[in-house]
């Protein structure tokens, strides 16, 4: 219960000031990881609707719990923190748009089994026209709206597998005192052609956010520590540059803005905007 509540609370906190009537972005402005999160939501809708249809509330609870812990807290919400905390504009609104859609659907799903909690969440959710005052009067979400094709799901299963291998190498680097927090790291990924094409399909800044490191470099060929992903080697070193006091990433652009000597160029531009 606490995991479900905390997931909702985190999302609500990051929707402060978000107006779904004016701030939602179009689907083509969502980042791929936002689309992945919505696809995971669609899978949850399929599973919970099937559970409710046969009164299998245990199945519903476990599906919701796994979604909140594995898909949201341990992955999506963790990866999107940099966008939410450190940027303005479309990138941040894209994450908020996905999170808003996720929480609206999730709250409807839990309403039959967590009545008071779901209404408490609903009271704090920003509303659009036509939404009921009470969540129990809302229709259950229908599957298909956020469904992704199998190729997209397979791609992201591979990306998550790569991320898991990077995390292993970062843990080793942490044990060797090479780095402390993961944002102190710069990661080099040695790839065969297939893995290179997979990773290169994601913008490098988004790939770094996915790994929660300051820098990612792709290299064709062999190198680094062997991994469970075929055609992938991983190496980690301490990132060059200094730590930005705002985003905590390491960058060689620290101090490039005279008015903000402790910020990276990105954060300085956001603060000045």
How should these model regions be labeled?
Residues 4, 72, 115, 170, ...:
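Residue-level signal for inorganic ion chemistry
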Residues 250-253, 270:
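Cys/His-rich metal-chelating microdomains
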Residues 18-49, 77-169, 173-197, 216-235, ...:
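Acidic, turn-prone loop/beta-hairpin segments
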Residues 2-12, 32-43, 62-83:
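Core structural elements
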Residues 244, 264-267:
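Short cysteine-rich clusters marking metal-coordination/redox-active sites
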Residues 48, 52-59:
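Short helix-adjacent coil turns
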Residues 253-262:
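Short linker/helix segments within small regulatory modules
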Residues 240-243, 260:
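Short metal-coordination and nucleic-acid-contact micro-motifs, chiefly zinc-binding Cys/His arrays
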């Amino acid at each position: 219960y606490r995991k479900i509540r905390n997931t909702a609370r985190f999302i609500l906190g990051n929707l402060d000031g978000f107006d779904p009537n004016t701030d939602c972005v179009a689907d083509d402005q969502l980042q791929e990881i936002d689309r992945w999160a919505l696809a995971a939501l669609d899978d949850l809708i399929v599973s919970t609707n099937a559970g409710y249809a046969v009164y299998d509330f245990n199945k519903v609870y476990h599906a919701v719990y796994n979604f909140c812990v594995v898909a949201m807290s341990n992955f999506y919400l963790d990866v999107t923190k940099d966008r939410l905390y450190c940027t303005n504009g479309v990138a941040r609104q894209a994450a908020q748009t996905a999170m808003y859609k996720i929480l609206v659907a999730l709250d409807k799903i839990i309403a039959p089994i967590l009545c008071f909690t779901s209404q408490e969440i609903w009271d704090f959710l920003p509303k659009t026209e036509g939404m009921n005052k009470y969540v129990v009067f809302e229709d259950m979400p229908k599957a298909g709206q956020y469904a992704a094709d199998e190729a997209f799901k397979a791609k992201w299963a591979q990306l998550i597998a790569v991320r898991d291998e990077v995390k292993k190498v970062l843990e080793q680097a942490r044990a060797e005192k090479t780095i402390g927090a993961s944002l102190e790291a710069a990661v080099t990924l040695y790839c065969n052609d297939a893995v290179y094409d997979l990773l290169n399909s994601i913008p490098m800044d988004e790939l770094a956010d996915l790994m929660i490191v300051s820098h990612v470099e792709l290299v064709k060929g062999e190198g680094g520590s062997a991994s469970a992903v075929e055609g992938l080697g991983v190496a980690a070193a301490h990132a060059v540059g200094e730590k930005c006091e705002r985003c905590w990433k390491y960058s060689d652009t620290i101090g490039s803005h005279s008015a903000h000597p402790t910020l990276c160029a990105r954060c300085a531009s956001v603060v000045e905007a």
